[in-house]
A protein has these predicted regions:
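N-terminal active-site segment of His-dependent metallophosphoesterases
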Residues: 1-63
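Extended active-site neighborhood of metal-dependent phosphoesterases/phosphodiesterases
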Residues: 58-161
Length: 162
């Protein structure tokens, strides 16, 4: 294997940034990384998005998820399957919802909801093993461990929904 290039980012806050700042906070860096804007591009084999794809103080919904998927697909030189995701605290659900349904459906690290996420597990350059909240993949002699924020009980007291 030649040089492996890993790009890591987090806290895109996709829907809230689009709503408040009219900024595509996930699509813009993807375009920049591919050199399709004023910024110079750079080589990457894998993009790790380390959580908080949503920036809302409330649980994300279908509209937010569809926007995330749209912005991931801004990539022209890379496949969605080259992008690996973790859930952050803003990506969480409430106690009365299926645990992390939004993350599992739209960010879909295991490729179980391809019809919503566009992630085809057979197309992963480095196949994943594990579960949506803790999984791993291997690149050469490096094992990458991905551990999400579960947030099963809903927002902590400091972010109690009003």
């Amino acid at each position: 294997m030649e040089q492996f290039n890993l790009w890591a980012g987090s806290c895109s806050h996709v829907h809230t940034d689009l709503e408040r700042l009219d900024r595509e906070s996930l699509a813009d860096p993807i375009r920049q990384s591919e050199g399709r804007t004023d910024a110079p591009g750079f080589d990457w084999d894998v993009f790790l998005h380390l959580g908080d794809t949503s920036g809302s103080q409330r649980p994300p919904n279908e509209e937010h998820g569809e926007e995330v998927v749209r912005q991931f697909h801004a990539a022209e030189d890379h496949r969605r399957e080259q992008m690996y995701n973790l859930a952050g605290n803003h990506d969480g659900t409430t106690p009365d919802q299926e645990t992390q349904w939004w993350f599992k459906r739209y960010l879909d690290p295991m490729g179980e909801h391809t019809e919503h996420s566009g992630v085809d597990p057979a197309e992963r350059p480095y196949p994943v093993e594990g579960t949506w909240e803790r999984y791993a993949f291997e690149v050469g002699n490096v094992r990458v461990l991905m551990l999400s924020d579960r947030n099963d009980g809903g927002p902590p007291d400091g972010r109690r929904m009003v």
